């Protein structure tokens, strides 16, 4: 919370405690007398005039803040903010619960949602409200919510959390319920961009998520970033399902204003496309384009989000080694919850590099740095296929017993079955390091 917000919160709490708004000098004078009586301390009248905006405001001293908090019954500003946060959070949940129980949204509900959209955990309240209306089959209400640009408007990190909550909800719906949600929500661009783009559910590409993408493709503008996004993901799904006839989606379709992750995804898919068609020249040209992009002023972590795991998929060990040597720190840049699946991919890539170079003990140590309990979200099952794939290769270097190799193989196949990605065969597992 910013300092101006803290001061505003303190002003509101003081006036609640005082029992009336402080809008006039006379009211301020009465407040000063009560303040001195209750705290047995003094704040000058001019200081109070500045604090309540009767004079040009200045930053209040720590002594002024301490006395005002004392008036409210707190030892310091931290104690005040802690209690105020709990009160605000309760009021938000209480109001959100009331909205959940309504049959439709009125103007007052929408106004309240807009006014509170900047609260730290607002996305939780909004997702909970949407969940309630979905379970009650009030789809029109959800349409109204997504049509409000001031309500569904988050930072990148929060979009990921919001989309994660809704997509996990969609997993629980039966076919008829899911179809109704698709019919109502897919035509709304803000829904597509705030949910489908931020939670790519690899585990359910053959389920609800794939259904959403197939419906979203014809609903979007063919020249838009989202149309390319749907094409890339759906064709990538086809590759993982061993379906031939992948579409040619050239990187020339990338526009300057496209999000950096989408740009990286486009290059990633082209590596897959040219590999599938045994076009070494096309694959080489795409790799050179990737290297060119890495020399530009871009967010390398976001650009490489899909590329590293594609290189693992295609067994491009030399390229993985180059990236690890040149961009290791950049690839491990973010530390929040949304980035760990990429961290694990980079560590897998580093392990493969070391295996490829014959540094078996160091490969094992690097592999052991991966904390699988932190791999969560939409990439979890997909990442775990690669985790057990590399685990198997390391086990081979340590001359593991057949029963241990079989146990790893079964875990690998369990995730393959869960995703349906038949590209990952037993033969692929056992011959991975043989190019």
Task: Label each region the model flagged.
Residues 1-34:
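A short, Lys/Arg-rich alpha-helix, primarily the initiator
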Residues 19-23, 34-60, 67-69:
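Recognition helix of helix-turn-helix/homeodomain-like DNA-binding domains
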Residues 38-42, 75, 422:
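Short coil/loop linkers at secondary-structure junctions
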Residues 70-148:
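Charged, helix-prone or intrinsically disordered regulatory segments positioned adjacent to compact structured domains
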Residues 123-435:
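Extended amphipathic alpha-helical coiled-coil/heptad-repeat regions
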């Amino acid at each position: 919370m910013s300092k101006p917000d803290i001061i505003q919160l303190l002003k509101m709490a003081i006036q609640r405690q005082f029992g009336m708004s402080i809008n006039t000098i006379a009211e301020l004078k009465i407040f000063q007398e009560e303040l001195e009586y209750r705290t047995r301390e003094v704040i000058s009248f001019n200081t109070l005039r500045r604090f309540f905006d009767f004079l040009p405001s200045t930053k209040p001293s720590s002594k002024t803040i301490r006395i005002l908090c004392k008036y409210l019954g707190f030892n310091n500003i931290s104690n005040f903010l802690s209690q105020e946060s709990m009160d605000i959070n309760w009021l938000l949940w209480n109001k959100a619960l009331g909205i959940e129980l309504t049959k439709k949204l009125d103007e007052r509900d929408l106004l309240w949602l807009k006014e509170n959209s900047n609260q730290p955990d607002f996305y939780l309240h909004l997702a909970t409200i949407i969940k309630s209306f979905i379970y009650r089959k009030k789809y029109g209400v959800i349409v109204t919510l997504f049509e409000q640009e001031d309500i569904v408007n988050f930072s990148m990190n929060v979009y990921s959390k919001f989309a994660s909550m809704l997509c996990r909800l969609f997993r629980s719906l039966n076919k008829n319920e899911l179809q109704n949600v698709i019919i109502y929500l897919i035509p709304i661009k803000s829904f597509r961009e705030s949910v489908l783009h931020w939670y790519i559910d690899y585990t359910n590409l053959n389920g609800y998520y794939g259904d959403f993408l197939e419906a979203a493709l014809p609903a979007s503008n063919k020249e838009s970033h989202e149309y390319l996004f749907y094409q890339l993901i759906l064709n990538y799904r086809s590759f993982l399902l061993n379906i031939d006839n992948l579409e040619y989606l050239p990187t020339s379709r990338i526009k300057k204003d496209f999000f950096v992750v989408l740009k990286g995804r486009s290059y990633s898919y082209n590596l897959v496309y040219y590999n599938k068609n045994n076009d070494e020249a096309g694959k080489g040209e795409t790799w050179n384009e990737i290297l060119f992009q890495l020399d530009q002023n871009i967010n390398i972590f976001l650009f490489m989000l899909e590329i590293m795991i594609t290189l693992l998929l295609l067994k491009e060990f030399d390229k993985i080694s180059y990236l690890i040597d040149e961009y290791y720190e950049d690839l491990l840049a973010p530390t929040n919850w949304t980035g760990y699946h990429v961290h694990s991919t980079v560590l897998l890539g580093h392990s493969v590099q070391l295996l490829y170079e014959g540094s078996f003990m160091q490969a094992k140590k690097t592999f052991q740095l991966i904390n699988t309990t932190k791999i969560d979200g939409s990439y979890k099952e997909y990442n775990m296929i690669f985790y057990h794939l590399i685990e198997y290769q390391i086990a081979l270097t340590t001359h593991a017993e057949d029963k241990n190799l079989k146990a790893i193989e079964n875990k690998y196949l369990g995730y393959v079955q869960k995703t349906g990605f038949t590209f990952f065969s037993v033969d692929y597992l056992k011959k991975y390091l043989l190019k």
